[in-house]
Curated annotation (Swiss-Prot):
This is Immunoglobulin heavy variable 4-38-2. GO terms for molecular function: antigen binding. Residues 54-70 are annotated as: Framework-2. Residues 45-53 are annotated as: Complementarity-determining-1. Pfam families: V-set. One of its GO terms (cellular component) is plasma membrane. Residues 71-77 are annotated as: Complementarity-determining-2. Residues 20-44 are annotated as: Framework-1. Keywords: Adaptive immunity, Cell membrane, Disulfide bond, Immunity, Immunoglobulin, Immunoglobulin domain, Membrane, Secreted, Signal. Residues 78-115 are annotated as: Framework-3. InterPro entries: Ig-like_dom, Ig-like_dom_sf, Ig-like_fold, Ig_V-set, IgHV. V region of the variable domain of immunoglobulin heavy chains that participates in the antigen recognition. Immunoglobulins, also known as antibodies, are membrane-bound or secreted glycoproteins produced by B lymphocytes. In the recognition phase of humoral immunity, the membrane-bound immunoglobulins serve as receptors which, upon binding of a specific antigen, trigger the clonal expansion and differentiation of B lymphocytes into immunoglobulins-secreting plasma cells. It comes from Homo sapiens. The lineage of its organism: Eukaryota, Metazoa, Chordata, Craniata, Vertebrata. Residues 1-19 form the signal peptide.
Length: 117
């Protein structure tokens, strides 16, 4: 029984640790057409440099979630093909933050933006 208990703790620990992770978006609430939207996500409770992909998603009014892109702590990026030409995601491990820049915004970019892991 001791072995089973240890195994359960070992499996459960990573989930417990990750449950303490908090992400907080910051940036302007409004951006004018043709301007660049800049958002920053500050991570607490976990070091970005320890791994995992970090990303941005958005939800236009009355629609579902749309993946914008993701970044690994090393700087490797992956973007939604439909937004790739306008999106830049970067990471600053020294500040434990990652950022989104979306250029040439239009009314079609109206959405609630979220950072995620």
């Amino acid at each position: 029984m001791k072995h089973l208990w240890f195994f359960l703790l070992l499996v459960a620990a990573p989930r417990w640790v990750l449950s303490q992770v908090q992400l907080q978006e910051s940036g302007p609430g409004l951006v004018k057409p043709s301007e660049t939207l800049s958002l920053t996500c500050t991570v607490s409770g976990y070091s970005i440099s320890s791994g995992y992909y970090w990303g941005w998603i958005r939800q236009p009014p009355g629609k579902g979630l749309e993946w914008i892109g993701s970044i690994y702590h090393s700087g490797s990026t992956y973007y939604n093909p439909s937004l790739k030409s306008r999106v830049t995601i970067s990471v600053d491990t020294s500040k434990n933050q990652f950022s989104l820049k979306l250029s040439s915004v239009t009314a079609a970019d109206t959405a609630v933006y979220y950072c995620a892991r």
